[in-house]
């Protein structure tokens, strides 16, 4: 499925349009399949993809992507008020990334 986070084929972080790699916003075997089905993928340039997986800043980058992914998922699939939508996302992916109380 096409990304619901960012429709343009460019790096999520810097906007580069070359040397792109597809990144699944949600990790793990089950969540990766769900992310594919729900469109929770983004393109990253090779530099940012390596930085995400290898650097000390990777966790911050990963959390930013997860928050963007959850917000996009709620806009596309959520039903009800924001609290209900967050609960729906949490049920599907096991965690809420928008609510700081869950971190």
Language model feature labels by segment:
Residues 23-27, 48-49, 53:
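Histidine (H) residue identity feature
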Residues 1-6, 100-103:
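Arg/Lys-rich, low-complexity, intrinsically disordered N-terminal tails that contact nucleic acids
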Residues 32-42, 50-103:
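Polybasic, low-complexity binding patches
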């Amino acid at each position: 499925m096409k990304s619901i986070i960012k429709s343009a084929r460019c790096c999520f972080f810097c906007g580069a349009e070359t040397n792109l790699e597809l990144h699944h916003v949600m990790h793990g075997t089950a969540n990766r399949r769900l992310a594919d089905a729900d469109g929770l993928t983004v393109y990253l340039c090779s530099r940012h993809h390596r930085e995400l997986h290898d650097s000390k800043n990777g966790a911050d980058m990963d959390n930013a992507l997860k928050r963007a992914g959850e917000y996009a998922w709620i806009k596309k699939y959520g039903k009800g008020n924001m609290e209900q939508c967050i609960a729906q996302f949490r049920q599907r992916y096991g965690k809420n990334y928008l609510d700081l109380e869950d971190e």
